Amino acid sequence: MVQQGFSIDLILARSREEAADGKDSMSSRPHIPCAPQPLPPNKYAKEMPRRKDGQDVQEHSSWSLGEQGKKLQYSSPSSAALHRSWGSSDDFSSVGSEDDSTEGSPSPMRNSQETETDHRGESPKSDLQRHLRTAFTPQQISKLEQAFNKQRYLGASERKKLATSLRLSEIQVKTWFQNRRMKLKRQIQDQQHNMVPPPVCYPQTFPYYPGVLPVPLNSGSFYQPPAHPFQAPQNSYIPDPRFIPQPLPHHIRMSVALQQQYPPLGLPPGRYFTGLASKNDG
């Protein structure tokens, strides 16, 4: 065995050599990041490789000071590389399994797109069938109009007879009658809307006083409405019952009896002159 000295110079020289060897190894080794680079967002981003404890794969490096000097210590990259390769293999296997599953089972997006294309392909045909209208001949229209003027609602037997006579189907006849009824309803509504209601004339009623002879309406004794709605009435005349003569002459009594027998328009018989007759009888 070769005995080595334990002098300070030998220890310092040995530490310098080890530090130089460490620098050379650092320059020769590839750079390994402490944390993995983030992957671009994709549909498999949720299935990142994780450890059992739930933490991402990370690499740690530590620096420690020894008794003889500063020594650079690195964690062995073999375990990290193995772990990374294991995670990448799992990732690729998961991607492959998903691809196989997607190829084996049709996705809902494809099903929805196929159904939409099917509906789009069928929609023009249905629209054409819906918008097809029956072209009636003038003879058919005239016979249908005659049947409609006689009866607006047809029974099953009558509709069948009419359809066979016109060489039409029962559905066509039924549809024509429905449209004709709607047309008639619109015409009636338009006529009612365009019609102007005639002016309503109400009979003028005047208070009756015993002993007063009927006065013509064109005289100024009764109140007449003003010509302008904002014009105030100038004068009005109401006879005073104190100046009515008592008892009444015979011809006035006869007129009272006639008025009781034939009352004015819109008034029940015996409503007026009852008080006057009782006075005269007394």
Curated annotation (Swiss-Prot):
Upregulation:
By bmp4 and its downstream effector smad1. Fgf enhances bmp4-induced expression.
**Which gene name belongs to this protein?**
pv.1
Location in the cell reads: Nucleus
Q: Which residues bind DNA?
A: 129-188
Please note every region of biased composition (Basic and acidic residues).
17-26, 44-59, 116-128
Indicate, by first and last residue, each region the UniProt record lists as having compositional bias (Polar residues). Answer: 86-96, 103-114
Tell me if DNA-binding is a UniProt keyword of this record. yes
Write one Gene Ontology MF term.
RNA polymerase II cis-regulatory region sequence-specific DNA binding
State the protein's purpose. Answer: Transcriptional repressor. Acts in a ventral signaling pathway downstream of bmp4, which suppresses dorsal mesoderm formation and leads to both ventral mesoderm and ventral ectoderm formation. Acts in the ectoderm to simultaneously specify epidermal lineages and restrict neuralization. Represses transcription of dorsal-specific genes. Binds to DNA, with preference for the target sequences 5'-TAATGC-3' and 5'-TAATTG-3'. Acts in a pathway downstream of bmp4 and fgf to negatively regulate erythroid specification.
Descriptive protein name: Homeobox protein pv.1
**Record SUPFAM superfamilies:** Homeodomain-like
Record's PROSITE patterns?
A: HOMEOBOX_1 (PS00027), HOMEOBOX_2 (PS50071)
Key words, A-Z: Developmental protein, DNA-binding, Homeobox, Nucleus
